[in-house]
């Protein structure tokens, strides 16, 4: 149902603002496919947004802002530790291969 409403709204927008009145179905299908995908965004901005929503560093998943005794997270050169919670890393979108570098 939601997809149908979205398709109708996109068709209306394309009809209103596009110079060509036909042939927008391919663009609409691509937009809907991007919205419907279950995978979260992989950009730096998306990772930072998700990390900020749970008050974590987007690079190492440690609590951010840190406590007075936090020494391993500076937000620039930090990496996930050996005992980092995998569920947090997965939510933020930190690839586990980054840990081995």
UniProtKB/Swiss-Prot annotation:
GO biological processes: regulation of DNA-templated transcription; symbiont-mediated suppression of host innate immune response
Keyword DNA-binding tagged: yes
The organism's place on the tree of life at top rank: Viruses
Region entry Basic, spans: 47-50
C4-type zinc-finger residues: 57-78
An MF annotation (GO) of this entry: DNA binding
InterPro entries in alphabetical order: Carla-bd
Cited function: Suppressor of viral-induced RNA silencing. The potential mechanism of action is based on sequestering siRNAs.
Protein name as annotated: RNA silencing suppressor
Species name: Carnation latent virus
Lineage: Viruses, Riboviria, Orthornavirae, Kitrinoviricota, Alsuviricetes
Underlying gene: TUC
